[in-house]
Amino acid sequence: MKSFITRNKTAILATVAATGTAIGAYYYYNQLQQQQQRGKKNTINKDEKKDTKDSQKETEGAKKSTAPSNPPIYPVSSNGEPDFSNKANFTAEEKDKYALALKDKGNQFFRNKKYDDAIKYYNWALELKEDPVFYSNLSACYVSVGDLKKVVEMSTKALELKPDYSKVLLRRASANEGLGKFADAMFDLSVLSLNGDFNDASIEPMLERNLNKQAMSKLKEKFGDIDTATATPTELSTQPAKERKDKQENLPSVTSMASFFGIFKPELTFANYDESNEADKELMNGLSNLYKRSPESYDKADESFTKAARLFEEQLDKNNEDEKLKEKLAISLEHTGIFKFLKNDPLGAHEDIKKAIELFPRVNSYIYMALIMADRNDSTEYYNYFDKALKLDSNNSSVYYHRGQMNFILQNYDQAGKDFDKAKELDPENIFPYIQLACLAYRENKFDDCETLFSEAKRKFPEAPEVPNFFAEILTDKNDFDKALKQYDLAIELENKLDGIYVGIAPLVGKATLLTRNPTVENFIEATNLLEKASKLDPRSEQAKIGLAQMKLQQEDIDEAITLFEESADLARTMEEKLQAITFAEAAKVQQRIRSDPVLAKKIQETLAKLREQGLM
């Protein structure tokens, strides 16, 4: 599998608009420099590799010969150590000469693994002359004795004197990684690449490793309910995300909510409604808001279902044999359960829906429980709950539709097609089976059939934005971008004509994403406007935010990009999605730090200017 950096070079930090605006980041500049320097082999030499992996590397200037027999050229006290009592009278030339001799003496001790003595002589050399090599050698000594803090301290002093000291940058990066200061390590590695000292193959694995560690650390810091240090990608993708204790969990985007509940036939009433009962009124209010398709209605429904469940439980405690109360409580718990599931609380969802089934089994309760099982990757239980739902109502189209979805995911295409056909037969006014059948045909490489099925759906549902929106996704996958843009425009137009949310911001995000594939100035501006509009219309959409963050990054609005990436992490459903957003944010922070350094920022502009001159940009 490709590394995160390799996969996301463009998405993270790598695009330059046609105006030539610089989008600064280590990997992008490095990538362009590789084009400039094709064939040039700037790899880490053996000594440098040894320095990062083997503490016994020789310091700079060390000789292979044995210690010289001649007496030292610098003044010596009676104990054999340097005598600086007359240092004030040393000439500049003498200071340089003595310092070099002391450094050479330190090298002899280093070569003989007498690191404490080597450290003393390097420090004495520094008393006479501040030299980056002396600090570098000191840092190498501290590598050998395992004092990583001192490695960083001495490396920093060397870099203050010689900012482009490649060997020391690499050494400090390694030490910072060992100290858990991954962001600092990333910065040094980025500077190394920007300097063009090493090629992409040399630096990228180290940067990738530190970026992963930094992102994992931030993930654990913010959400802390998975062992991120040892988690595999599969564990991250299946681990339900638990928000911070100080932050209330929210519902997903209203676009997602409308899409999810749009599959079900609206249930706007229930048996034995008593308008004098506050619990009944809350349940009725919840059902009414659930199908209003407005931005605020889902939060209102959530609140009402929660209140209704609490009130019905109180009433049932006083009269636990009342079957009517049991049914009403079951309906309430069914809905609090699915809302908890959508808010990333699968355990709470399972508990509520299980209790609802025990009180009064309903088709939707079984469907929701099946979805919880699917979220756990338990396909066996998933199908079992659908079987139970069909025993209650063998003609419920939603059961067949959701079972078809699972078969589609598992690539059981024949069975998926049968389920979608049945759902379509049972509820011909539900648009989603039509769309899924068209998507299924495309998945089976039958584009003509796919197009025919979309045409059928369009004839039956001429005002439905779902048809052009999903067809645009298919056309995008087919690389038919011009037609896809037209379909997205049609979907946006149809959505705007309707009361309520149907496809929501999906066509706005889809069109923006498509525009960025042809990165002209005009397309970037339009894509940014579309994503800003999408984020305002649906503030809980992580897709809109992460897309907008990438645009802000490319426009050098790094602060805003970081904020949006971090907000995306809060909104994302799974740990894997959260990790990706955090990784983007941490990569952007490195870019921010590089560009805030005047020397590095100047170097970035110089590098890009050269590339423009050569026609590489």
Swiss-Prot record:
Query: Where does it localize?
Result: Mitochondrion outer membrane
Per the UniProt entry, the signal peptide is: none
Residue intervals on the Mitochondrial intermembrane side: 1-10
The family note in this entry says: Belongs to the Tom70 family.
Q: Which organism is it from?
A: Saccharomyces cerevisiae (strain ATCC 204508 / S288c)
Q: GO cellular-component terms in the record?
A: mitochondria-associated endoplasmic reticulum membrane contact site; mitochondrial outer membrane; mitochondrial outer membrane translocase complex; mitochondrion
**Function field:** Component of the TOM (translocase of outer membrane) receptor complex responsible for the recognition and translocation of cytosolically synthesized mitochondrial preproteins. Together with TOM20 and TOM22 functions as the transit peptide receptor at the surface of the mitochondrion outer membrane and facilitates the movement of preproteins into the TOM40 translocation pore.
Can you say where the TPR repeats lie in this chain? 99-132, 134-165, 281-315, 363-396, 397-430, 432-464, 465-498, 505-541, 542-575
Which residues does the entry place in the Cytoplasmic compartment?
31-617
Provide a Gene Ontology MF annotation, just one.
protein-transporting ATPase activity
**Domain of life, per the record?**
Eukaryota
The molecule here is called Mitochondrial import receptor subunit TOM70
Here the segments flagged for biased composition (Polar residues) are 229-240
Q: Please give the start and end residues of each transmembrane region.
A: 11-30
Q: How does it assemble?
A: Forms part of the TOM (translocase of outer membrane) complex that consists of at least 7 different proteins (TOM5, TOM6, TOM7, TOM20, TOM22, TOM40 and TOM70). In the complex interacts with TOM22. Interacts with TOM37.
Q: Which residues carry this modification: Phosphoserine?
A: 174
